[in-house]
């Protein structure tokens, strides 16, 4: 049976935390920042954990992730 391939789009966008959660960047920070308050923009910094249901799908895209 051939090796499974990792989806390149998934490995660029998601990281697996030490506890196995899928971490992703906050959405909504590409454009349109002028109409948002500074506090709204600050809240979009960093990463957030994905829901368990969606994380399960993303983990299937990365079969060789160490903590998957």
UniProtKB/Swiss-Prot annotation:
Per the record, its GO cellular-component terms are: cytosolic large ribosomal subunit
Q: Which InterPro entries match?
A: Ribosomal_bL35 (IPR001706), Ribosomal_bL35-like (IPR021137), Ribosomal_bL35_CS (IPR018265), Ribosomal_bL35_sf (IPR037229)
Query: What GO molecular function annotation could you give as one example from this UniProt entry?
Result: structural constituent of ribosome
Ribosomal protein: is it a keyword of this entry?
yes
Q: Which Gene3D superfamilies match?
A: 4.10.410.60
- Supply the alphabetized keyword list: Ribonucleoprotein, Ribosomal protein
A GO BP entry is: translation
The answer to whether UniProt assigns keyword Ribosomal protein to this entry is yes
Q: Which family does it belong to?
A: Belongs to the bacterial ribosomal protein bL35 family.
Q: What is this protein called?
A: Large ribosomal subunit protein bL35
Organism for this UniProt entry? Pelagibacter ubique (strain HTCC1062)
Q: What is the lineage of its organism?
A: Bacteria, Pseudomonadati, Pseudomonadota, Alphaproteobacteria, Candidatus Pelagibacterales
């Amino acid at each position: 049976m051939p090796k499974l391939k990792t989806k390149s789009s998934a490995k660029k966008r998601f990281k697996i935390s030490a506890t196995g959660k899928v971490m992703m960047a906050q959405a909504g920070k590409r454009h349109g920042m002028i109409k948002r308050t500074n506090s709204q923009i600050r809240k979009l910094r960093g990463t957030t954990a994905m829901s368990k249901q969606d994380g399960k799908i993303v983990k299937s895209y990365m079969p060789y992730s160490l903590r998957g």
